[in-house]
Curated annotation (Swiss-Prot):
<dbReference type="GO" id="GO:0051082">
    <property type="term" value="F:unfolded protein binding"/>
</dbReference>
<dbReference type="InterPro" id="IPR029047">
    <property type="entry name" value="HSP70_peptide-bd_sf"/>
</dbReference>
<feature type="compositionally biased region" description="Acidic residues">
    <location>
        <begin position="599"/>
        <end position="613"/>
    </location>
</feature>
<dbReference type="GO" id="GO:0140662">
    <property type="term" value="F:ATP-dependent protein folding chaperone"/>
</dbReference>
<keyword id="KW-0547">Nucleotide-binding</keyword>
<comment type="function">
    <text>Acts as a chaperone.</text>
</comment>
<keyword id="KW-0346">Stress response</keyword>
<dbReference type="InterPro" id="IPR029048">
    <property type="entry name" value="HSP70_C_sf"/>
</dbReference>
<dbReference type="InterPro" id="IPR043129">
    <property type="entry name" value="ATPase_NBD"/>
</dbReference>
<comment type="similarity">
    <text>Belongs to the heat shock protein 70 family.</text>
</comment>
<keyword id="KW-0067">ATP-binding</keyword>
<protein>
    <recommendedName>
        <fullName>Chaperone protein DnaK</fullName>
    </recommendedName>
</protein>
<dbReference type="InterPro" id="IPR018181">
    <property type="entry name" value="Heat_shock_70_CS"/>
</dbReference>
<dbReference type="GO" id="GO:0005524">
    <property type="term" value="F:ATP binding"/>
</dbReference>
<dbReference type="Pfam" id="PF00012">
    <property type="entry name" value="HSP70"/>
</dbReference>
<keyword id="KW-0143">Chaperone</keyword>
<keyword id="KW-0597">Phosphoprotein</keyword>
Length: 613
């Protein structure tokens, strides 16, 4: 069975891991980095992903970052040139890139993956993530929650201990907190909570706003109107945030950020950790309520938690660590890398699926309550939040009017009492209900949630046994046909990228061969026949002509022909050099012999003794 890779598809950075020898291992990207920026750029018809895309964000407007914030969002598209892309397609480009370098590392095709999502992702966002995997050519065997994955990475070697663990996960764009119970190889999620609109990007933005305000105050120029300046500010803000995790103040220096009446203007400011904490205190405070709610839903007090695990790059911020310590009364555990834990845990789950990991059971929960709209616009819950999945629940309803021929089933997810305030997952209709007074027909509505947290709903008329089912699709509205089309386009893009690389490699080979041929022909002058030299020159000219015409097939043929001729001539030159060396060696040997025969002088000697002795 091929390997099941674990992918942490993050807002700002992504990572991939695989199980080797019973232990999860991060797979480095082509640049040698253990995480890959979740950034995609489009340039000259080429799609670039990762660090190379992030580096050109300042100068290339066709660069997309933090697309995860919009996954599952109805109608959201990014326009690049004359083409529009859904968040699933952009995410698929990142996944495709990760899949490719994972295959290069493993030396085999990768078709199966476990992909992580924020614990507080709703059904639409989970389904959209699964669709992105499918577009990228991956069979997504399981969608698991990020905090749960971290706990898997943490607890893999601790299956004999019983612990209650709180995972605080503050990533680039989302925040989650989960409470789990670990024991005897069972990882049971007791509760989960979070905020899918809060993350490290917001901390960066707080610094950016501070820089914009101060620069405007000093120079009267609003940098927020300058797109290129704002990208430079974003990069500087991110760097300053990271610096302040280790130092008490940092210098932000951006020369030529703008221009005034008297010439260029430079941004030079010092940001202290104290000021940074003041700017972001409201963001840190926003994470407190989800922590307390998760503890409450788990039926635990903070002092009953054995371990606190920090996950996500933003948990390196000292104020965040201090806040978590104050709220839980526990010093956070730093035994796992917050940037890598999620991918490592996903790889462990991949090992469970492939059978490489035994005696580990993962029991996750649904993050939000599920139900339907009933009379008066009320949201009636069928499955409460933090119910262990997979699960199934049925409830019987009836008609609201006499002789009602059909019922509309409006499926919702959320915690608010009124249907209008919750997230619509889908609608469907059960028709052909026999005429009967109000309240007589018995309509059974059944919810099924699978292990990925994806919802199936059915409605059945118990009188006629007529049934209607719906698998809740992502509200982004991607049909199976659209997903298939996007998969085909993704494969074509990959093929086009491969072809483009082959073209570049061919042109580089040709340039190098022409240069090498010119050099070799100069060395061969007077050492091989004129006919042989002319043959090589003619072959070179034919290759130059094919190069100028950009005829790729002709270039391949002419390159191979010239390469063969040059190789033959080089071998000949080498043989000549060897023969000359041997001849020179023989002549030197003769000269030495002659000296021995003619130049040796025999002489007598006598011992001279010291007379003073």
């Amino acid at each position: 069975m091929s390997k099941v890779i674990g992918i942490d598809l993050g807002t700002t950075n992504s990572a991939v891991a695989v199980l080797e020898g019973g232990q999860p291992k991060i797979i480095t990207n082509p640049e040698g980095a253990r995480t890959t920026p979740s950034v995609v750029s489009f340039k000259n018809g080429e799609i670039q992903v990762g660090e190379v895309a992030k580096r050109q964000a300042i100068t290339n407007p066709d660069t997309i970052a933090s697309i995860k914030r919009h996954i599952g969002e109805a109608g959201y598209k990014v326009t690049v040139g004359d083409k529009s892309y859904t968040p699933q397609e952009v995410s698929a480009m990142i996944l495709q890139y990760i899949k490719k370098f994972a295959e290069d590392y493993l030396g085999e095709e990768v078709t199966e993956a476990v992909i992580t999502v924020p614990a507080y992702f709703n059904d639409s966002q989970r389904q959209a993530t699964k669709d992105a995997g499918k577009i990228a050519g991956l069979d997504v065997k399981r969608i698991i929650n990020e905090p749960t994955a971290s706990a898997l990475a943490y607890g893999l070697d601790k299956t004999e201990t019983d612990e209650k663990v709180l995972v605080y996960d503050l990533g680039g764009g989302t925040f989650d907190v989960s409470v789990l119970e670990l024991g005897d190889g069972v990882f049971q999620v007791l509760s989960t909570n979070g905020d899918t609109r809060l993350g490290g990007d917001d901390f960066d933005e707080a610094i950016m706003n501070w820089l914009v305000e101060n620069f405007k105050s000093d120079n009267g120029i609003d940098l927020s109107k300058d797109k290129m300046a704002m990208q430079r500010l974003k990069d500087a803000a991110e760097k300053a945030k990271k610096d302040l995790s280790g130092v008490s103040s940092t210098q932000i220096s951006l020369p030529f950020i703008s221009a005034g009446e008297n010439g260029p203007l430079h941004l030079e400011m010092t940001l202290s950790r104290t000021e940074f904490d003041r700017l972001t205190s409201d963001l840190v405070d926003r994470t407190k309520a989800p922590v307390m709610n998760a503890l409450k839903d788990a039926g635990l007090d903070a002092n009953e938690i054995d371990k606190v695990i920090l996950n996500g790059g933003s948990t390196r911020i000292p104020a965040v660590q201090e806040a978590v310590k104050n709220w839980t009364g526990k010093e956070p555990d730093h035994s796992i890398n917050p940037d890598e834990a999620v991918a490592l845990g996903a790889a462990v789950q991949g090992g469970v699926i492939s059978g490489d990991v035994k005696d580990v059971v993962l029991l996750d929960v649904t993050p939000l309550s599920l139900g339907i709209e009933t009379m008066g616009g009320v949201f009636t819950k069928l499955i409460d939040r933090n119910t262990t999945i997979p699960t199934s629940k049925a409830q019987t309803f009836s008609t609201a009017a006499d002789n009602q021929p059909a019922v509309d089933i409006h499926v919702l997810q959320g915690e608010r009492p009124m249907a209008a305030d919750n997230k619509t997952l889908g609608r469907f209709q059960l028709t052909d209900i026999p005429a009967a007074p109000r309240g007589v027909p018995q309509i059974e509505v059944k919810f099924d949630i699978d292990k990925n947290g994806i919802v199936n709903v059915s409605a059945k008329d118990l009188g006629t046994n007529k049934e209607q089912k719906i698998t809740i699709k992502s509200n982004s509205g991607l049909s199976d046909e659209e997903i298939d089309r996007m998969m085909k386009e993704a494969q074509e893009n990959e093929e086009a990228d491969t072809k483009r690389k082959e073209e570049v490699d061919l042109k580089n080979d040709v340039d190098q061969l022409i240069f090498q041929t010119d050099k070799t022909l100069k060395e061969l002058e007077g050492k091989v026949s004129d006919e042989e030299l002319q043959k090589a020159k003619d072959a070179k000219e034919e290759l130059v002509k094919a190069q100028q015409e950009n005829n790729l097939e002709d270039m391949k043929t002419k390159r191979d022909a010239l390469s063969e001729i040059v190789q033959e001539l080089t071998v000949k030159l080498y043989q000549q050099a060897q023969e000359a060396q041997q001849a020179a060696g023989g002549a030197e040997g003769n000269a030495t012999d002659a000296k021995t025969d003619d130049g040796t002088v025999d002489g007598d000697f006598e011992e001279v003794k010291d007379d003073k002795e």
